[in-house]
Amino acid sequence: MTGISVRTHELYLIVFVTRYLDLFTTFYSLYNSVMKVLYIVSTASIIYTIRFQEPIKTTYDKGQDTFLHYQFGVAPCAVLAFITHIIGISSKHNSFSIIELLWTFSIYLESISILPQLIVLQRYREVENLTGNYVFFMGAYRALYILNWIYRAHYEPHYQHHWVVYFCGVLQTLLYADFFYYYLKAKTSGSKFSLPTAKQGN
């Protein structure tokens, strides 16, 4: 698992658990429920495999995956979500909802969950083909979400706009911008995919 950040997956697990708490309160459809459970279970399985299961465990480079994801990811997003939720219920005169608060938190956290992975790749500089493709498609799905919002806003008369979702979606896509540039540059030129170091960028 060289080049893969388990900390990014740990952040995504927190995202899915806090976002899908409505599994216990609201039933939408069997498909919806199964997919939510699948997201949580598959992400937890990936984390367990990388951290504890041999021989995968020995290929995980802890020394490169050192971003303080709880201090600089979870904590700031929790504070921001609380402030946003309080402002929202005050302006709309709604009651406090822990499920809504955690949903907002999950949106903020998802937007920066890729940071540990991008930092690991920059430290390695040369990115393996499989790892590069994996991260590219993780970012591409979020970029496609933006196109989906534009489409639905145009064609659905009663589409509900959510500016926190918009902001976080754009932010997440922008975090990938540098990676996308070098990934596509390597693919079009047929060269080896590598990312510049911070020293090179100056």
What is the role of each PLM region?
Residues 1-202:
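Alpha-helical membrane-protein topology signature
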